[in-house]
Every structure is written in structure tokens, then in C-alpha cells.
Amino acid sequence: MASLIYRQLLSNSYVTNISDEVNEIGTKKTTNVTVNPGPFAQTGYAPVDWGHGELPDSTLVQPTLDGPYQPTSLNLPVDYWMLIAPTREGKVAEGTNTTDRWFACVLVEPNVQNTQRQYVLDGQNVQLHVSNDSSTSWKFILFIKLTPYGTYTQYSTLSTPHKLCAWMKRDNRVYWYQGATPNASESYYLTINNDNSNVSSDAEFYLIPQSQTAMCTQYINNGLPPIQNTRNIVPVNITSRQIKDVRAQMNEDIVISKTSLWKEMQYNRDIIIRFKFANSIIKSGGLGYKWSEISFKPMNYQYTYTRDEEEVTAHTTCSVNGVNDFNYNGGTLPTDFAISRFEVIKENSYVYVDYWDDSQAFRNMVYVRSLAANLNDVVCSGGSYSFALPVGNHPVMSGGAVTLTSAGVTLSTQYTDYVSLNSLQFRFRLAVSEPSFSISRTRMSGIYGLPAVNPNNSAEYYEIAGRFSLISLVPTNDDYQTPIANSVTVRQDLERQLGELREEFNSLSQEIAVSQLIDLATLPLDMFSMFSGIKSTVEAVKSMTTNVMKRFKTSSLANAISDLTSNMSEAASSVRLTSVRSVGTITLPRARVSLQVGDDLRSMQDVSTQVSNVSRNLRLKEFTTQTDTLSFDDISAAVLKTKLDKSTQISQQTMPDIIAESSEKFIPKRSYRIVDEDIRFETGIDGTFYAYKVDTFNEIPFDMERFNKLITDSPVLSAIIDFKTLKNLNDNYGITKKQAMELLHSNPKTLKEFINNNNPIIRNRIENLISQCRL
């Protein structure tokens, strides 16, 4: 049978080389993965010997002394020592707060007996008594008066051979050095208003911050060193000193090191990231009440913004990882609203935004180290989506929100429609926010996260502001661009090609001949016959087959097959007899509808959910058991083969995903039969379940206890012609018992006879299965 292709893909082993494994790992995004290849993370191949490059000969030393400054009058900055260095005796400095404090400092040379000298202080001629008994030290004397016309009184002295004194304004006080060197120490004498206290210096001076008080004390006691590192070579006016808060430039290019061929450049950039989510909403076939999938898709977005008066063109790609699958089943009837799967991102999810712009920083982004970024948070709020049902009120899914917080940045490659770009990938972790999301007219409410149904909420884009910095090894010649080698990237975006291929595959369903499909489904398709219609070389077919097997081995079907034993045992034990006692013996569809109220409705829905889970595992059991009957997988493989032959867009890169996806998504509404003498049990993945007699097609009570025993021992058959179709065929056309048995066993010869006779019921059923072969 045609499903042989799926069995071969699962059972055949394959070989691969390490580069294939690395590329495969690189294309998958996983959470909590840190790559540390050394001091540099590169997207290509770094030089074999990468040194630090050329280093400057000189060493920059932060100046200790801020000065010297010319004699002047100023409002001394708070928390700064004013270190005064006079060269001769006389008035050194004076100051006042203009209300109740006037102070002055004079310098007296050695060997001066008690004498009276005249000084000009505060604009007045003042007679002061001074003395200095030392023969080697000079004496600084501090005088203070409390009224404008009061008398100056001596408060403190400092004896030193170095002719250095210092004072400082701090905490509304004036601090001053006193005593004799080398044991002079600081003290305070005045309480003043710092804001209005001016100081006038008659000698050159330096400014030393309070944090370097120990250095100032060393100068007072030991003098200035013979050679000083000063801010100014010669004394300058204090107005040339402008104390400003210096902030790092956000957008700058700094040369770290340089040789003849290479240089290291540090790029600092502010950044505005704008991104959008994309989604896919797929409606199931049938009456129009079912949706098969609502999922997130990668989204490219291009925009411009202004950075330092320069217009920047940027490109982002947004994708998600670690999604959570939800579903909703409103009931067992074909007119009950249901969503087979819809994706929601929550705390365990990640959002990836790949960013590139046309600035110099991205021109040679091949060899990069010291990559860092700081970004703001952003809240993404979901909008509303109305599910348009053919009849009745429309359910509306609305709400949901998550907060995106930066969780790291790494190198990546964006694949646009025309070019691949080395870019930065920003990773965001998620936290759920208010409001929760719900589906109106259902019991699904109060769930937190952001559903894929309308993640942008009619917003043009989401925006994040921040900055990044990196050091890149680039050619010394700015006109030369580093060639980009084949990269091992964090993600490779083939979604555009796959999207176009999916659309083509879905449109080809109408071109498939039903009778030819049955013939093809009975053929033992192997891997090479499956790919025989694809124009390619023999080597390409071998490589393609290997890639298909690798991808198929990680598909949902392959993972489910590996756990078949545990799945079947769990499925069998999950359906309990007690779970359907409240339903009783359900014989007709009308009776089932009449019982769907209150507790009976809830019990029916519980059984429907459990039966749906069992039916999925029945597919696995049938898949591992080869029979001569036709199965859903035979039809699925035949449709796949037909579409591959007709496709014009299939390629070696997209083939593995298409093969794996078809095994998971083709014919989502399947039913399976279990044989029990003259009784057939039929259960569907959509939750429907029937038990009926073979000879009359009359429905009988569904014996759950008997069903539990049969699902582990009896053979499983695909209900290609399901119970409703058989009953409709028998009621309208009448069929023999032999035909009934062959249709129940999905005999391909009998199916083809009905199709060739243009039986509308059988033909419509097969056409419906073909229409369900969608991606």
C-alpha cells in the first residue's frame, strides 16, 4: 500500500556528517541555551591568529591636580578643597557669607617677632598683630570677624615649610588645615551658608575633590612633588574650568586597535525595534463550524526612523518559540463549534526579533565580541476575532496580554526575499499580563497568555527602544566589505517558501482524479518512487531522501509511534465504564441530542474527549499493523505523491518539511473501526462514537467495557467509508451484505467499482477526504 513510504521513513537508518548535525541544531530554537565559543562569537570563520592589534605607546594618567588657576574671586564648589600655593608673604585669601562671617588668611615669613601689619581686607585697611617664631617654617594665620565693622580675631594657624594651605566648603561649614607639618590635620571653624559664600584668592590655587582628601593632606604635610600631573600647564582663569556631567555618546564608532589589514571597532548605537506578529487561521472542511489550526508565523517588517538626525532603514523578523497548544471542542455534532488547535504564548515561551539596519555597524558584522544590549519592556495585548459560523451567534476570542523583557542578544542571519543579512537576534522572555483571554458563548475564560488569533490587536507594530554595543573585527580599509561565509545561524527562515508551497498544494486538490487516486493508494510506494517525478540528479535525490528521513524521524507521528505501547495502555485505562453511566444506552442521534443538557451534557463531552484521544492512538496501532485493506495513510500518501508530481515549487530544502507535515495534517477527521463478531465499534478523532450491527446498520448501545478490552487485542481498520456514509448508502441505494462487508473493510476494489459507477455518495466521501489533505 502507499503508506509504505511512511513506514520506510520510520524504519530506515541513515548516516550524516557533523556539518549536517550542526546545521540542524542551528535551525532549531530552544530555550535556556547559552553558546560560549570563547572571547568571540562569530557567524563565519575567524582568523587563525587574532591578536590585540597595535597598541599606543603612551599611557594616559588621570590628573590628580585640577589647576593651577590664576588668582580670582569665585563661589568655591562644595566638597572641593581649595589648595592655595602663595609665593610670598601677605594676604593669601579672604571670604564671606555677607551676613555674619568674614574670614581672612595671611602668610607670615619665618623669624618674625610679634608685630603689627596693615592688610586690605574686605575693602578696608586693617591692622593685624602677627608673629612667627620658627626659623624654617612659614605660618598661615586665619582671622575671623562676625560683623561688617567688627575686629578680626585670630582663630587658627598652620606652620609649614611648603607654603601650602587649603580650605573646603562642606555641610554648611568651612574646613581648614591646622597645626604644624608633617602632622597637620583638618578641622572646621565656621558655620556658613554654602550657596552665598564667596572666596577671593590672591595666589595660584588647585581644586581637589573631597574624595581625594588623603592626597590633599599629603600635599599639605609633604609639599607638591617636583613634577606634577596637572590639568593645566600654566595658570589659567577659573572660567576655563567648566564642570559638566559628561554622558557617553549613544552613537559612536571607536577604534579599539588597528593593524595594517584589520582593526577592531566598537559600535555604540541607540536602537528602535519595531515588529509584528503573523498568524495563520485554517478552517476545517465540512459544514463550517470547525477550525483546524490557529498558529503563529514568522513576520518580516521594514521601517525607517531617525537616529542622530540620520534616517535609518531597518528590517526585523519576529518569531516565537515554546508555544502552548490549546483546543476547544463544543460537542460531538457536526454543527458544534470546535478548534482543533490554537497556539498561545505564555511564561515558558520566547519571542525572537532579528534586527538589521543600514548603518556601518552591520556592514561587516562577521567577527564580533563584547556584544551587549539594554532594551525597554513592551506589553503585547491581544485583540478580538469573531468565528463566523454559518448559523447562530458567532463566538469571539478576545483578550490576552504578555510583557516582553529582554533576555539576551546574539548574532543571527535574516533571510529576506532577496538577500541574507547578518543581524542581531534579540531574545525576549515573557510574563503574562492582564487581561486574560476568553471565547464568548463558551466556558473557556480566565486563561492568561497571548493567543495567536489576533496578537497585534489592530496595532501597526510594537515598538521597543534601547541601545546596543559590540566590538567587530573589520578591514582597515573602510571601502572593503568582509565576505559573508555560509553561516551557522540561530534560525533559518524558510517559511516564505513553505507558505507558497502550501498554497500550491492546497489548490492542487481539485485536480486529482478520484479513480486514479484509489489505484495509486494501492501501490507499494517506496522512497525513490515517491520522488521519481521530481526533476533532479541522482545525487540530489539521495541527499533529499536523507534529509526527508532526518526530518520525518522528529515528526509527531514518529515520536508517537515510539511511545505506542505506553500510549495504548494509557488510552485504554483512561476510558472508564463509570464515565458513561450517566449517558445510558444511547441508540440514536436524536436521543443523544435530547440528553445533552445539564450533567448529561458534561458527561457526554467527557466521553467524547476520551474517545477522541483513543482514536488518535488507534491510528498508531493501525499504522504498525500491515493489512490488505485501504487506510487513511494510503490515501494521504497517494495524494502527496500526486501533488509532488504536479508541483512546480517543490525543492530539496522544502521537501523534508512537506513530507513530515503531510503525515501530521493530512485528513485530520479520521474514524477507526474495531471488529467484534457481527458488531462494529467506530470512533472518530472528532470525538464521535458508534456501535452498530453489520447486517442491519442499526445502532446499538456503545458498550464501553467491551470496547476497553477490544482496543488492545482486536485489529484496527480505517473507516474510509464511515458509518453515516454507509447508512446513507444503504438507505438510498441498498447494498448487499458482501458489499457492506467489503466497504467495512475498506476493500479498494469495491471502492473503485462504486466510483466507476459514479455513485455520488461514495465519490463525495472520497472527494471530502482529498479536500482534507491540506497543509
Curated annotation (Swiss-Prot):
Q: Which Gene3D superfamilies does the record match to this protein? A: 1.20.5.170, 2.60.120.200
Indicate the segments annotated as coiled coil, or none if absent: 484-511
Q: Which cysteines are joined by disulfide bonds?
A: C318-C380
* Annotated spans, Spike head: 65-224
Q: Where is this region: Hydrophobic?
A: 389-409
Q: Name one GO biological process term.
A: permeabilization of host organelle membrane involved in viral entry into host cell
Q: SUPFAM superfamilies given for it? A: Concanavalin A-like lectins/glucanases, VP4 membrane interaction domain
Name the Pfam families on file: Rota_VP4_MID (PF17477), VP4_haemagglut (PF00426), VP4_helical (PF17478)
Query: In this chain's numbering, which residues are marked as the site (Cleavage)?
Result: R231, N232, R241, Q242, R247, A248
- Region Spike foot, residue ranges: 510-775
Record-level GO cellular component terms = host cell endoplasmic reticulum-Golgi intermediate compartment; host cell plasma membrane; host cell rough endoplasmic reticulum; host cytoskeleton; membrane; viral outer capsid
Give the record's keywords alphabetically.
Answer: Capsid protein, Coiled coil, Disulfide bond, Hemagglutinin, Host cell membrane, Host cytoplasm, Host cytoskeleton, Host endoplasmic reticulum, Host membrane, Host-virus interaction, Membrane, Outer capsid protein, Viral attachment to host cell, Viral penetration into host cytoplasm, Viral penetration via permeabilization of host membrane, Virion, Virus entry into host cell
Motif YGL motif per UniProt: ranges: 448-450
For the region Spike body and stalk (antigen domain), what residue ranges are annotated?
Answer: 248-479
- Which family, according to UniProt? Belongs to the rotavirus VP4 family.
What else does UniProt say about it?
This strain probably does not use sialic acid to attach to the host cell. In group A rotaviruses, VP4 defines the P serotype.
Record's protein name:
Outer capsid protein VP4
